[in-house]
Amino acid sequence: MRSSCVLLTALLALAAYYIYIPLPSSVSDPWKLMLLDATFRSAQQVSNLIHFLGLSHHLLALNFIIVSFGKKSAWSSAQVKVTDTDFDGVEVRVFEGPPKPEEPLKRSIVYIHGGGWALASAKIRYYDELCTTMAEELNAVIVSIEYRLVPKVYFPEQIHDVVHATKYFLQPEVLHKYSVDPGRVGISGDSAGGNLAAALGQQFNQDTNLKNKLKVQALIYPVLQALDFNTPSYQQNMNTPILPRYVMVKYWVDYFNGNYDFVQAMIVNNHTSLDVDEASALRARLNWTSLLPTSITKNYKPVMQTTGNSRIVQEIPQLLDARSAPLIADQEVLQHLPKTYILTCEHDVLRDDGIMYAKRLESAGVEVTLDHFEDGFHGCMIFTSWPTNFSVGIRTRNSYIKWLDQNL
């Protein structure tokens, strides 16, 4: 009996040691976030072991775990019709909300899920529930795109998928089929999906052949640049779940099918050091000392290496491509973008990406709403139902949908 108690105590101590991580007191539901983070870390470690054993790529294994535990079939309710189909060869899940008697045509959002361009699915519970709620509360048609993921495809194939699916949807006959008003269509996405949505928005507003333009874009804690991994939010939140800095840098390397040997050099900005000529013209476009308010910059100092590793951008030139990093786009491109909503979270390495993009858009004359949550963390908006229901998840979702309701 005594040995059993000792063993149980030891196991509980080990579990507590594994689960506990120091978190800021201001973050929403800290113990619940620790449990969520521990679960995700466990899945990552299992997938890394599978990769080490040569059984599968670690990202395929990790996504298999995520999708297996969360996949949801296309189930319609009395209020929302849900169907799986494809648009120009790209899988989509369509959510058709209830019509308003006084409005024969509905508004619509094309939604792009997050997951570091490598994980998740439009068909997992979190995104299915989000899009169902959007369709019902907005009386809208939501098109959730099931774009292809790393490592099956790499940049720019993810962009191609969302462009093809969205262009197909914007055809007059397709909009008519779903009873959608051509003048009330927007694009949206979270995290890596926000990256793809921003890239698509820039591309569409330069496409003179498109008859139907996007009315709004709504970007949820978007990832927007890979030149500076030492912005104040990257420094402040380098170890904060569920997106530590080293994980975000690895997602970038994976997106470009790059070399993991570059990760540590990129973390300290060796890839954009002063001797890397390719990056010199772009630095002003993400100069956070001028783009961020002093309340954020505080005592943080820019990390600018005099000499670094020019081989990184030579082997991965996509790092400097505005299609992958919309924050570095030309000012002339930004000035034609539609009304924009950007949601940022305090406890997120990507916080400053969103704030800097909002500033650049405002400078270009775009109407922008920056919605910041002091207790938010990366990914929080999809965590709204038990057992992963967070107070800030519900508040961010409600704020996001309210903005869409007022502006779309």
From Swiss-Prot:
A Gene Ontology term for the protein's cellular component: plasma membrane
Glycosylation sites: 270, 287, 389
GO molecular function list: acetylalkylglycerol acetylhydrolase activity; serine hydrolase activity
Descriptive protein name: Neutral cholesterol ester hydrolase 1
Job of this protein: Hydrolyzes 2-acetyl monoalkylglycerol ether (1-O-alkyl-2-acetyl-sn-glycerol), the penultimate precursor of the pathway for de novo synthesis of platelet-activating factor. May be responsible for the hydrolysis of cholesterol esters (such as cholesteryl (9Z-octadecenoate)) in macrophages. Also involved in organ detoxification by hydrolyzing exogenous organophosphorus compounds.
Record key words, sorted: Cell membrane, Endoplasmic reticulum, Glycoprotein, Hydrolase, Lipid degradation, Lipid metabolism, Membrane, Microsome, Signal-anchor, Transmembrane, Transmembrane helix
Gene expressing this chain: NCEH1
Cytoplasmic face of the membrane: 1-4
